[in-house]
Amino acid sequence: MSCTNSPEAVKKLLENMQSDLRALSLECKKKFPPVKEAAESGIIKVKTIAARNTEILAALKENSSEVVQPFLMGCGTKEPKITQLCLAAIQRLMSHEVVSETAAGNIINMLWQLMENSLEELKLLQTVLVLLTTNTVVHDEALSKAIVLCFRLHFTKDNITNNTAAATVRQVVTVVFERMVAEDDRHRDIEPPVPIQGNSNRRSVSTLRPCAKDAYMLFQDLCQLVNADAPYWLVGMTEMTRTFGLELLESVLNDFPQVFLQHQEFSFLLKERVCPLVIKLFSPNIKFRQGSSTSSSPAPVEKPYFPICMRLLRVVSVLIKQFYSLLVTECEIFLSLLVKFLDSDKPQWLRAVAVESIHRLCVQPQLLRSFCQSYDMKQHSTKVFRDIVNALGSFIQSLFLVPPTGNPATANQAGNNNAGGPASAPANSGVVGVGGGVTLLPAFEYRGAWIPILTVTVQGSAKATYLEMLDKVEPPTIPEGYAMSVAFHCLLDLVRGITTMIEGELGEVEAEGPSVTEGASSQSSERRDEQAASDPMDQETVSRAVWEEMVSACWCGLLAALSLLLDASTDEAATENILKAELTMAALCGRLGLVTSRDAFITAICKGSLPPHYALTVLNATTAATLSNKSYSIQGQSVMMISPSSESHQQVVAVGQPLAVQPQGTVMLTSKNIQCMRTLLNLAHCHGAVLGTSWQLVLATLQHLVWILGLKPSSGGALKPGRAVEGPSTVLTTAVMTDLPVISNILSRLFESSQYLDDVSLHHLINALCSLSLEAMDMAYGNNKEPSLFAVAKLLETGLVNMHRIEILWRPLTGHLLEKVCQHPNSRMREWGAEALTSLIRAGLTFSHEPPLPQNQRLQLLLLNPLKEMSNINHPDIRLKQLECVLQILQSQGDSLGPGWPLVLGVMGAIRNDQGESLIRTAFQCLQLVVTDFLPTMPCSCLQIVVDVAGSFGLHNQELNISLTSIGLLWNISDYFFQRGETIEKELNKEEAAQQKQAEEKGVSLNRPFHPAPPFDCLWLCLYAKLGELCVDPRPAVRKSAGQTLFSTIGAHGTLLQHSTWHTVIWKVLFHLLDRVRESSTTADKEKIESGGGNILIHHSRDTAEKQWAETWVLTLAGVARIFNTRRYLLQPLGDFSRAWDVLLDHIQSAALSKNNEVSLAALKSFQEILQIVSPVRDSEKPEPPAVSVPVPVLLGNLSGPGLSRPFVRTDSIGEKLGRCGSETPVVTDELEDLKLWWAAWNTWHRTGSESTEPPSSVDELTFIPSQPFLTALVQIFPALYQHIKAGFSMADLQKLGVILHSAVSVPISSDASPFILPSYTEAVLTSLQEAVLTALDVLQKAICVGPENMQIMYPAIFDQLLAFVEFSCKPPQYGQLETKHIANAKYNQIQLFAPAEWVALNYVPFAERSLEVVVDLYQKTACHKAVVNEKVLQNIIKTLRVPLSLKYSCPSESTWKLAVASLLKVLSIGLPVARQHASSGKFDSMWPELASTLEDFLFTKSIPPDNLSIQEFQRNESIDVEVVQLISAEILPYANLIPKAFVGQMMTMLNKGSIHSQPCSFTEAEIDIRLREEFSKMCFETLLQFSFSNKVTTPQEGYISRMALSVLLKRSQDVLHRYIEDERLSGKCPLPRQQVTEIIFVLKAVSTLIDSLKKTQPENVDGNTWSQVIALYPTLVECITCSSSDVGSALKEALAPFKDFMQPPASRVQNGES
């Protein structure tokens, strides 16, 4: 437009206009003056406009009516020259758009007049065209008039004018619609278009904008005209043809679809006018039936008219293509009509144009997709797309089934018109005859029908022949085979189009998301439709639903048609195309997961590959894919699927045997079979990824073909033609011989190409091969015929070529070999399976995987897993192969096994106990190799498995040596852990962190044994646990070795453990082991085990299971106790140490109370161990502190370390602990907590002591009596224990202790043991037990001594305990009801070793005497203690000593009473002063009578001295008696005033009694001299005398002892004198004994001394009674005068002399009497 607006263009326009006007003026000068004037005034007008206006063009347009008037007048002259000049000038104005609406109307009116006068017709058309194309000022009636003008010119008699007018009409119609489109574009920004719904109602035309209204009126009138109705708008039309109208309608619909789609008014026209019009015009075609009447008879039905019909089909094509969304129902009708026109009763040309129309649709896959969406996927709607495909199939079948008709009216187009019967066969036979039946023309031949294949179009384009014949009036002649060829191309293009489209879209989706998986049901479309309608599904799901529906809709029809064509094809290219179509459909169905349809297409190809009626079960199975005898419903007709005909018109290329169990006849293969086979191979090769389960079909077919062709698997798995011997019936032509290498090569490449399959597809391939293999194995079961090795060979081949992703197929592949082949009864097949399996495993391990195997644990495990699975096969040959394979792997790959170790170790560990010694030995060799060579190379995470496997060999009971060696291996493993601890720990921690992270990501907790201990600690714990299991093995040797190793390991390497891990060691390992050992020990069999055969003897201490378990119990308990002792500093800070301590104590207690002496004694040794007499230090380099200062005799032997002759050492060296505890500060344990532990120990000790020493209530053979070593050990524990609890040790505890000590000492010993324990009876030696008891009490009294005041109340209890022991000297304790014998009477000779034991009482005298010494010693220290005073300890001592003192010579041991009296003297020397101090308190009141009785019983004992007592001994004994009297003299009588009078009286009486010689009747005459205790008597008398003359008395109260002594002395003198007189008288001449003479002399002297003393005493101090007694002596003295002894006489004289003073009473006396 810029060119017409530029100043230059405007200037030129003005010049041209003036020039035109001048020319017009010149031409009309003479003839037409008015025109001339108008022209001249026009010039002036133009000049004026140019001068006055800047916008010249606008001004011209405004005045255009005036400007154009001269030219219109010129046209009115009807002069050709002037008219041409004017029309040219008008066109120039139009081209510059300076014509107003009015001017334009005037121009059109002028043109109309010219048209009616038939002037300048071509120029008119040109002018109209310029007017309408250059501007938009012409509207409404002016426009309609212009269009009618063109139509009128179309129907002139001049062909040139007609054709030009036709072109102009077409152009004008286009312009009208283009204007509308431009108008819409202008208004689009203001009013966005509303999309038209298919069911929209008509809107008023008045709402349309001007251009739209014009277009609407024009289109409406075109419909009117085609329908032969009068136009509403195109007024003035005189003539119109239907064909031209249809062409115009088609062009508008085709060129301006958006007009109809965007405007409801136009869409209304489409629905209400166009569609009904088309349907009406189709009426003759629908109703017409070919052959219903002859052509000569009058036709009641209007015949189809080719030009109209063909144009209608073109319109329908446009309607369908552009407006299916608007015209859902109408398009459904049109498509149904198209399908109907294919019916065999329609004219041949109609069927041809219909199939061409359908072809047009078939090359538009997007259009087909729309049909599917709009119709097939809607409920209750015609399945249009399905019907089209089925109609094509039906059409093709009809062309084969119906021979040509002989109708002369259509003979020239017959080809094969479908209406006649067999009678018309000759018409066709001529055609066949031309080729002589062996024509080389491509054709389809089926059951006598021969149809040539014509080249009708290039594939992919629908170049129609008959739809383009717009100039033809008569129906064209259709060549033979044309319809078939077009229909064939329809099928191929349909397949190509939809597969290309869907695969393209599918590719885009798959590029974004996951691929479709097999199993998506092809039946799910309807359900998906509903979902698509109701749910806002995502685009992919909707698309997938459409694809699936399209395939579902068309596959049946396609397959029916293609199968028929395949069977009928005699042309290799056509066959290739058909097979390609089937192949692409199969591949597409596969990609969409439509299993049924995929399998159907594949089955068709498979059937085509095999000879007719070949008995292949996989193809004849009753699946949805089965083709034979299947009916598909096509357009309501039941059309049988045509199976391949047996009347083969193909070249036979091979004859062979079928693959079957039963021998059958031969079968023939044709070239088409081979072609199909190649397609099948191609399908498998290129589309293996989507074959899925149909691999079964493909491979089964290939296997049979291979067998028929005689191809056999060679060593590498490739197939080669077999030897003639193998297939005597196989005959191959040269034609197929050239194909065989190719086929063989493709087969090999097929399995090689499996490396390009996706994973799912590869699985399907493997599954199919496995199924084939199973078939072959089944055949091999029942007969000796060679099995087909196809499947197994290809399994191996597939495995080897897919090694890069072997994990995908590994499980099914190896699973099949493992579960089926390796377990086949046929040993060769089994062996082959094992060989294949191990080969695959080895190949897998040597393959360079990416990432490498050491970094790909999962893959390595996968590869090795079948090796492990072979363990489940029971055939020994397979197991041997397996272990050999393991050995090979270890030797070749051992260093790089990495993560594969667990499985390799698992294979070794899987050898079961019952699998024979040789397999176990082989497996154990593998393990030994691993432990010696490969521990450093394997991942640390596998070390635990090594431990488990080694442990499992320990549990094998086939051979003891293997078990013991495996325990040795465990020790070696632990050493390895110890040496490489740091490295192993780092690696394990790293692995643990990775696993922890994975577990957290998965949201699960880490699951490993002994979690949450650190991983390195877990390794140790597993080792300990495994050794723990072996510690309870049924075999004693294994138990012993395992126990020693366990405790050695913990002892030697335990410091490597984290502190917290000790908790697990204690609870999960040690206590768990103790529990199991205790349980086994307590339930073990007591039956005696017979000595084994040969020279093996079992020691009597191990001859029952119970005794053997006892050894284990001892070892275990000792080990645990040692750990508690040596690792106490580690264990005590643990949170629940006190609970652990309690459990350990419980174990010690239960063991200590065991009836087995070995166990019980060991338990006490363990108890002693854990009490830690010496506290452990943190580092062994520190000097150990001196032991607690308690002399505890320890019976423990040196507990040298158990296990492998390694000493039990504490390895807490600085080096080891630097990394462990060095940085930690020692944990200071709470003292209270510590105290609690010791009290728990005390309670355990108390319970153990109480229960073990409790005397039996009844006596039977089963009574258990604890041994002396046990009791000794028990008591020896106390002092150490007491050091920890003394602060809280109460009186009640002391009493408990006393009970135990008393009971322990009371226990007798077995006569078996007595020779080893008892000292000889004469030795005064204590047993260890007695020593221990006294030590315990010693510890106690020492602690009390230095302890606080409140402890001293315990002294009396100590005394009581000791005094109880003292009593044993005379009265040995009784142990319950047990009968004991004296040691001398017990039998303990060695010959009676196994006789029932007797119980021997011990010699308690030394013990009692030692106890007495302790009492004295203790009393000396404690006599003054308040408690000792209050609790009458002295009285108790005296009371206790009274027994041996009264027995005196009757005591079991002479030493006892001597010690007792000595002790009494010592005790009294200390105690009497104390008693005097407390005289007033009365605390000793009860003691005096006890003392008096004791002294009385001792000094005047009833026991008789033994006969063999020597004189010296007697004298020594008498001196002891004298000492006692001296004590009385020194300690009692001087303090008489502080002592009860009764007691003093008793003393005096006793002295009186003692002072008279007593003569036992048993003395011989010779002994009387010395046996009369002369010294004793003298001492008594002297004492009496001494106290008679005590001048110290100052008060009468203090003098009572003197008075008492005098009284006793005088009485005693009187008695002696009387007895002497009597004896003298009786003796006659015989002299009296010397002692008696001495005694009488002594008495006489004493009397004289007494009287002298009395005289000297103050008179007031002498009692009158005393004098009376003295005077009473006188008559007796006088009687003695007659005695014969001179000595007596002189003494008598001295005695009588003092009596002279009594002859007169003294003065004082008188005075006293007076006063």
Swiss-Prot record:
UniProt keyword list: Acetylation, Endosome, Membrane, Phosphoprotein, Protein transport, Transport
Gene label: Mon2
Protein's name according to its UniProt entry = Protein MON2 homolog
* Modified residues annotated as Phosphoserine in this record: S204, S534
Family assignment from sequence similarity: Belongs to the MON2 family.
Region (Disordered), start-end ranges: 506-540
Q: List the disulfide bonds.
A: none
What this chain does, per the entry, is described as:
Plays a role in regulating membrane trafficking of cargo proteins. Together with ATP9A and DOP1B, regulates SNX3 retromer-mediated endosomal sorting of WLS away from lysosomal degradation.
Could you mention a single GO BP entry for this protein? Golgi to endosome transport
